[in-house]
Protein backbone atom coordinates (compact mmCIF):
# COMPACT_ATOMS: atom_id res chain seq x y z
CA UNK A 1 0.00 0.00 0.00
CA UNK A 2 1.53 3.32 -1.02
CA UNK A 3 1.08 6.38 1.13
CA UNK A 4 2.28 9.96 1.22
CA UNK A 5 3.93 11.33 4.35
CA UNK A 6 3.19 15.05 4.77
CA UNK A 7 5.91 15.81 7.31
CA UNK A 8 9.58 14.96 7.71
CA UNK A 9 9.15 14.04 11.39
CA UNK A 10 8.27 10.35 11.70
CA UNK A 11 8.01 8.36 14.94
CA UNK A 12 6.65 5.07 16.17
CA UNK A 13 3.43 4.89 18.12
CA UNK A 14 5.26 3.57 21.20
CA UNK A 15 7.42 6.72 21.40
CA UNK A 16 4.36 8.96 21.08
CA UNK A 17 2.52 7.08 23.83
CA UNK A 18 5.56 7.32 26.12
CA UNK A 19 6.05 11.12 25.94
CA UNK A 20 3.84 12.94 23.45
CA UNK A 21 4.56 16.45 24.82
CA UNK A 22 8.31 16.14 24.20
CA UNK A 23 7.82 14.59 20.75
CA UNK A 24 5.51 17.40 19.59
CA UNK A 25 7.77 20.07 21.11
CA UNK A 26 10.76 18.75 19.09
CA UNK A 27 8.79 18.51 15.83
CA UNK A 28 9.42 20.97 13.03
CA UNK A 29 6.21 22.55 11.85
CA UNK A 30 4.16 21.21 14.75
CA UNK A 31 3.21 17.92 13.09
CA UNK A 32 4.50 14.36 13.42
CA UNK A 33 3.65 11.30 11.33
CA UNK A 34 2.96 8.37 13.65
CA UNK A 35 3.68 4.86 12.37
CA UNK A 36 2.29 1.57 13.65
CA UNK A 37 3.59 -1.73 12.23
CA UNK A 38 5.76 0.13 9.69
CA UNK A 39 2.77 1.86 8.15
CA UNK A 40 1.48 5.41 8.67
CA UNK A 41 -1.30 5.37 11.26
CA UNK A 42 -2.11 9.05 11.90
CA UNK A 43 -0.66 12.52 12.43
CA UNK A 44 -0.09 14.15 15.80
CA UNK A 45 -0.46 17.94 15.64
CA UNK A 46 0.25 20.68 18.17
CA UNK A 47 -2.65 22.96 19.14
CA UNK A 48 -0.92 25.94 17.50
CA UNK A 49 -0.45 24.07 14.21
CA UNK A 50 -4.07 22.86 14.34
CA UNK A 51 -5.24 26.47 14.75
CA UNK A 52 -3.14 27.49 11.71
CA UNK A 53 -4.59 24.67 9.61
CA UNK A 54 -8.17 25.48 10.60
CA UNK A 55 -7.64 29.19 9.84
CA UNK A 56 -6.19 28.29 6.45
CA UNK A 57 -9.10 25.97 5.68
CA UNK A 58 -11.61 28.65 6.68
CA UNK A 59 -9.81 31.23 4.52
CA UNK A 60 -9.84 28.91 1.51
CA UNK A 61 -13.53 28.13 1.93
CA UNK A 62 -14.45 31.82 1.48
CA UNK A 63 -14.82 33.07 -2.09
CA UNK A 64 -11.78 34.86 -3.49
CA UNK A 65 -13.84 37.79 -4.72
CA UNK A 66 -17.22 39.32 -4.19
CA UNK A 67 -18.16 38.97 -7.86
CA UNK A 68 -20.97 36.48 -8.31
CA UNK A 69 -21.88 35.00 -11.66
CA UNK A 70 -25.46 34.53 -12.73
CA UNK A 71 -26.91 31.11 -12.15
CA UNK A 72 -27.44 30.73 -15.89
CA UNK A 73 -23.69 30.20 -16.30
CA UNK A 74 -23.79 27.21 -13.97
CA UNK A 75 -26.96 25.57 -15.17
CA UNK A 76 -26.74 23.62 -18.38
CA UNK A 77 -29.99 23.05 -20.23
CA UNK A 78 -31.14 19.48 -20.21
CA UNK A 79 -30.77 17.78 -23.54
CA UNK A 80 -34.12 17.03 -25.08
CA UNK A 81 -34.42 13.30 -25.64
CA UNK A 82 -34.69 12.19 -29.23
CA UNK A 83 -38.21 11.12 -30.01
CA UNK A 84 -38.30 7.41 -30.74
CA UNK A 85 -41.50 6.33 -32.47
CA UNK A 86 -43.73 4.17 -30.31
CA UNK A 87 -44.55 0.72 -31.52
CA UNK A 88 -43.53 -0.66 -34.88
CA UNK A 89 -42.44 1.69 -37.63
CA UNK A 90 -40.89 1.56 -41.09
CA UNK A 91 -37.30 2.68 -41.47
CA UNK A 92 -36.94 6.41 -42.18
CA UNK A 93 -33.92 8.49 -43.29
CA UNK A 94 -33.32 10.28 -39.96
CA UNK A 95 -33.35 7.11 -37.83
CA UNK A 96 -30.44 6.84 -35.38
CA UNK A 97 -29.48 4.08 -32.93
CA UNK A 98 -29.30 4.95 -29.23
CA UNK A 99 -26.23 6.71 -27.84
CA UNK A 100 -25.19 3.56 -25.96
CA UNK A 101 -25.63 1.33 -29.01
CA UNK A 102 -22.22 -0.35 -28.68
CA UNK A 103 -22.97 -1.38 -25.09
CA UNK A 104 -26.40 -2.70 -26.06
CA UNK A 105 -24.90 -4.60 -29.00
CA UNK A 106 -22.45 -6.24 -26.60
CA UNK A 107 -25.39 -7.35 -24.44
CA UNK A 108 -26.91 -8.97 -27.54
CA UNK A 109 -23.68 -10.86 -28.21
CA UNK A 110 -22.35 -8.57 -30.93
CA UNK A 111 -19.01 -7.06 -29.92
CA UNK A 112 -18.37 -3.95 -32.00
CA UNK A 113 -14.88 -2.55 -31.44
CA UNK A 114 -15.70 0.73 -33.14
CA UNK A 115 -18.92 2.71 -33.37
CA UNK A 116 -21.09 2.35 -36.45
CA UNK A 117 -19.81 4.59 -39.22
CA UNK A 118 -22.04 6.98 -41.11
CA UNK A 119 -21.56 4.88 -44.25
CA UNK A 120 -22.65 1.66 -42.51
CA UNK A 121 -25.70 3.40 -41.06
CA UNK A 122 -26.62 4.95 -44.42
CA UNK A 123 -26.36 1.59 -46.20
CA UNK A 124 -28.48 -0.07 -43.51
CA UNK A 125 -31.17 2.63 -43.67
CA UNK A 126 -31.25 2.63 -47.49
CA UNK A 127 -31.67 -1.16 -47.60
CA UNK A 128 -34.45 -1.32 -45.03
CA UNK A 129 -36.26 1.73 -46.40
CA UNK A 130 -36.58 -0.07 -49.71
CA UNK A 131 -37.80 -3.24 -47.97
CA UNK A 132 -40.62 -1.36 -46.25
CA UNK A 133 -40.70 -3.71 -43.23
CA UNK A 134 -41.84 -2.48 -39.81
CA UNK A 135 -40.13 -3.28 -36.51
CA UNK A 136 -39.78 -1.83 -33.02
CA UNK A 137 -36.83 0.51 -32.34
CA UNK A 138 -34.94 -2.12 -30.35
CA UNK A 139 -35.43 -4.63 -33.18
CA UNK A 140 -34.00 -2.14 -35.67
CA UNK A 141 -30.97 -1.74 -33.42
CA UNK A 142 -30.51 -5.50 -33.20
CA UNK A 143 -30.72 -5.75 -36.98
CA UNK A 144 -28.15 -2.96 -37.32
CA UNK A 145 -25.79 -4.71 -34.90
CA UNK A 146 -26.01 -8.01 -36.80
CA UNK A 147 -25.66 -6.24 -40.15
CA UNK A 148 -22.52 -4.39 -39.05
CA UNK A 149 -21.09 -7.57 -37.52
CA UNK A 150 -21.62 -9.53 -40.73
CA UNK A 151 -20.30 -6.80 -43.03
CA UNK A 152 -17.18 -6.31 -40.92
CA UNK A 153 -16.46 -10.02 -40.55
CA UNK A 154 -16.96 -10.80 -44.25
CA UNK A 155 -13.69 -9.07 -45.01
CA UNK A 156 -11.73 -10.52 -42.09
CA UNK A 157 -12.32 -7.44 -39.99
CA UNK A 158 -10.56 -5.28 -42.55
CA UNK A 159 -12.25 -2.28 -44.15
CA UNK A 160 -13.64 -3.02 -47.57
CA UNK A 161 -11.37 -2.23 -50.49
CA UNK A 162 -12.17 0.56 -52.88
CA UNK A 163 -13.26 -1.16 -56.09
CA UNK A 164 -12.24 1.89 -58.09
CA UNK A 165 -8.59 1.81 -57.01
CA UNK A 166 -5.99 0.45 -59.40
CA UNK A 167 -3.87 -2.24 -57.80
CA UNK A 168 -0.08 -1.99 -57.89
CA UNK A 169 1.81 -5.04 -59.20
CA UNK A 170 4.38 -6.60 -56.88
CA UNK A 171 7.78 -6.04 -58.48
CA UNK A 172 9.74 -7.85 -55.78
CA UNK A 173 11.62 -10.92 -57.04
CA UNK A 174 12.09 -13.63 -54.41
CA UNK A 175 15.61 -14.96 -53.81
CA UNK A 176 16.50 -17.85 -56.14
CA UNK A 177 14.46 -16.55 -59.06
CA UNK A 178 15.78 -14.58 -61.99
CA UNK A 179 14.16 -11.39 -62.89
From Swiss-Prot:
- Keywords assigned: DNA replication, Primosome
Pfam families referenced in this protein's UniProt entry, alphabetically: DnaT
Q: Return the Polar residues bias intervals.
A: 151-168
Segments carrying the region annotation (C-terminus) are: 84-155
UniProt entry tagged with the keyword Translocase? no
GO-annotated cellular components: primosome complex
Cross-referenced Gene3D superfamilies: 1.10.8.1180
State whether it acts alone or in a complex, and with which partners, per the record.
Answer: Homooligomerizes. Interacts with PriB. Component of the replication restart primosome. Primosome assembly occurs via a 'hand-off' mechanism. PriA binds to replication forks, subsequently PriB then DnaT bind; DnaT then displaces ssDNA to generate the helicase loading substrate.
Domain description from the entry? Answer: The C-terminus (CT, residues 84-155) forms a 3-helix bundle.
Instruction: State the family named in the UniProt similarity comment for this chain.
Output: Belongs to the DnaT family.
HAMAP family, per the entry: DnaT
User: What is the protein name for this chain?
Assistant: Replication restart protein DnaT
* Gene source species: Salmonella typhimurium (strain LT2 / SGSC1412 / ATCC 700720)
